[in-house]
A protein has these predicted regions:
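Anionic group-transfer/hydrolysis microenvironments
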Residues: 18-19, 49, 78
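Short glycine/serine/threonine-rich phosphate/pyrophosphate-binding segments
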Residues: 23-25, 52-55
Length: 116
């Protein structure tokens, strides 16, 4: 883990943890272990599809259990749909929720800048 902190003196650092908090990143380490070590605010990215609410809430619960700060949940909209995942998540959590879609980059960037 110390290799991740070596010579980092930037004002903004982004570390991607693919697969979820409890996905392995090494033989005896999970993404959550890296997150705990680095103590950076989390941006939880969830694909906007059926099951997104459950995935987001479970990840938020795991972050809370491990005393990790979550800056926001990002719903990644690959395809237009009639789901109301953003509205549902806003109702279930106090964590900010933003959406990202191919055509809405400027709006997304302005929302994210306020949160991180």
């Amino acid at each position: 883990m110390s290799a991740c902190k070596h010579d980092v003196d930037e004002s903004f650092v982004l570390v991607e943890g693919a697969g979820g908090l409890y996905s392995p990143i090494a033989e005896a380490a999970l993404n959550v272990d890296l997150a705990i070590e680095l103590q950076l605010p989390l941006l939880i990215v969830i694909r906007d599809e059926l099951g997104a609410i459950s995935q987001a809430l479970l990840t938020l619960e795991a972050a809370k259990k491990n005393n990790l700060k979550v800056a926001c949940v990002i719903l990644n909209v690959f395809e237009s749909n009639n789901l109301s995942n953003k509205e549902a998540l806003v109702a279930y959590t106090k964590t900010p929720v933003v959406s990202f879609s191919q055509g809405g980059l400027e709006v997304f960037c302005s929302e994210i800048e306020k949160l991180v």
